[in-house]
Amino acid sequence: MIRGILLLLLGTTRFSPIQCISNDVYFKMFSQQAPPEDPCYNKAHEPRACIPDFVNAAYDAPVVASSTCGSSGAQRYCEYQDHERSCHTCDMTDPLRSFPARSLTDLNNSNNVTCWRSEPVTGSGDNVTLTLSLGKKFELTYVILQLCPHAPRPDSMVIYKSTDHGLSWQPFQFFSSQCRRLFGRPARQSTGRHNEHEARCSDVTRPLVSRIAFSTLEGRPSSRDLDSSPVLQDWVTATDIRVVFHRLQRPDPQALLSLEAGGATDLASGKYSVPLANGPAGNNIEANLGGDVATSGSGLHYAISDFSVGGRCKCNGHASKCSTDASGQLNCECSHNTAGRDCERCKPFHFDRPWARATAKEANECKECNCNKHARQCRFNMEIFRLSQGVSGGVCQNCRHSTTGRNCHQCKEGFYRDATKPLTHRKVCKACDCHPIGSSGKICNSTSGQCPCKDGVTGLTCNRCARGYQQSRSHIAPCIKQPPRMINMLDTQNTAPEPDEPESSPGSGGDRNGAAGMAAQSQYYRTEGGRECGKCRVSTKRLNLNKFCKRDYAIMAKVIGRDTSSEAVSREVQRRAMDPDVADYEMDQVQPGSARSPITGVYEFQAADYPNPNPNPRGSEMERFDLQIQAVFKRSRPGESSGAGNVYGMPNTTLKRGPMTWIIPTKDLECRCPRIRVNRSYLILGRDSEAPPGYLGIGPHSIVIEWKEDWYRRMKRFQRRARTCA
């Protein structure tokens, strides 16, 4: 039988879940759902004002009562209905007879009413308070107290609010049948914008009303535009609510009279059923009361079944939700780069504009400070914000990477901007590295990096002497002016006169007395050592293709050392003059222990204007320099004529990249024509006739210029055009 029932069920299609649900609906159940939209941003992810849901802020919140029936043992309380009074027993130790304050904020169910009851009042001066803590700031719309069934109504009470978690209190609303006598306020007070933030008083003696309600915005002029009214925003804000009951309404005197008449008693249930008594005695009791609310035996008390506070979690328009953290504290889930329990401030490093409440017109999102990635902290400056016409007010703090300024956009003192790097680069600022002796300070130009140089000093870091100055041993004046006879020897080019150029050509290399300021050949001077020197030839004419063509070689070489053993060099030069086939390596064997000393100097010098037409007379003293040829732009080919007047008889075909020996007459060095410095590169143009084979020499046709990068392209251009040389 059971088997038949199972077959019947399986054969019935309406019980098959797969067949009851269509394929589309079935697969949609497991498809990935799009995340819900954030109420604080629109579809374009632009910020907009958002608010949390409207809630009963009092639900399940803690309430502290100053008086609770039965807290000090079993007590009697009485209820009044029509002309009958019924009395009961309360006891906090008995759950069925206890009326704790937590009943005020539990789930309100009309079918199962729970109440808080105070201890029976003993006179009109008793004040009973209820204090409700909301946990954080809320923007409230109403406060409602629901009375327990058959409970006497309060005649006078005050609702207070606190915005600092109970540290201070201010009146929120007064209730009384005698507003002016008790609180000094009229029962019907007109409200304008000047007093819309003040508490008012209203009458609570309306019959057949089981609750007391207070609306925070009712009758206040700015309530329709709360966003633009900071006064009302503060008015509706509260962290705690306190209700103070001052006195009860007087019950029916006939019901109070029954207290003396006695009646049936149900001790088991704690309920007293007292019949109504009529007679003149009732009037006597009322007269004895003298207007007081209660007597010690009346059993009158305050009884509230529900304490409701409607409002929204205060997030200032920057959050759509409040949640409880691990410590149980209620906080806003802030958006718009805001922070705080109420989103009342901008989060760190977002102070480029002042914090403001979000409105329907403007979200007032907090903006990140612009520190170009060089700072992690900033602050807001209102004066700067005003000067920028409301664009930016953030001031960066503790700028890193040697930067400074409001936006860390400048290099601090002692550093300058590296233009090759973006402003956000961590190495955008380079140290000035000003020379401690050559500079007059450690602070360079923040843009160019130029250090302030002392007189006669030049260079980006003030590390060399300027033209016309020579180095001294003084730290105060490291570069001093050279004598006039030495200044005339300076020029940016080392240009010798061409033999075939007219001597009267103005500005040419052969013009010895022309407008170009050439020194006369016959003018001489003596050095401190007594040597007679002719002035170095100076020319303002640029190096050109004609001069390139008239030289046998053109090289770029670096001076790497100097040999001071001039006598051995002179003997070797004489021997090579007599036997040009001697190998180069023998020169090194002649000087196995030669010493090299650095040559100091600052300027570019030219070859001397030799009075003797024989540039290197045999037997004259020579100085030897070690060169490292770095580039060869021109050299003589085998069999090519080395020009007229070649005293050595053959072209120099050994020029190539690598080491080479450069010989210069001692006289020319002492006369500083040219002035050679170790570890400097030079452009050298000359003729093979000015030195024996295997050497480079200096003669009247030599050109020696300190190397500059611009020369490379010019030499290459001359190389290509050399075929046009005559």
UniProtKB/Swiss-Prot annotation:
Netrins control guidance of CNS commissural axons at the midline and peripheral motor axons to their target muscles. SUPFAM superfamilies: EGF/Laminin, TIMP-like. Disulfide bonds join C313-C322, C315-C332, C334-C343, C346-C366, C369-C378, C371-C396, C399-C408, C411-C429, C432-C444, C434-C451, C453-C462, C465-C479, C533-C671, C549-C725. Residues 1-29 form the signal peptide. Pfam families: EGF_laminin (PF00053), EGF_LMN_ATRN (PF24973), Laminin_N (PF00055), NTR (PF01759). This is Netrin-A. It comes from Drosophila melanogaster. GO terms for biological process: animal organ morphogenesis; axon guidance; compound eye development; dendrite development; dendrite guidance; glial cell migration; motor neuron axon guidance; regulation of photoreceptor cell axon guidance. Residues 490-516 are annotated as: Disordered. PROSITE patterns: EGF_1 (PS00022), EGF_LAM_1 (PS01248), EGF_LAM_2 (PS50027), LAMININ_NTER (PS51117), NTR (PS50189). Glycans are attached at N108, N112, N127, N445, N652, N679. Residues 533-725 form the NTR domain. Keywords: Developmental protein, Differentiation, Disulfide bond, Extracellular matrix, Glycoprotein, Laminin EGF-like domain, Neurogenesis, Repeat, Secreted, Signal. Residues 313-368, 369-431, 432-481 form the Laminin EGF-like domain. Residues 46-312 form the Laminin N-terminal domain. It is found in: Secreted, Extracellular space, Extracellular matrix. At the midline of developing CNS at the time of commissure formation and in different subsets of neurons, muscles, and epidermal patches. GO terms for cellular component: axonal growth cone; basement membrane; cytosol; extracellular matrix; extracellular region. The gene is NetA. The keyword Kinase does not apply.
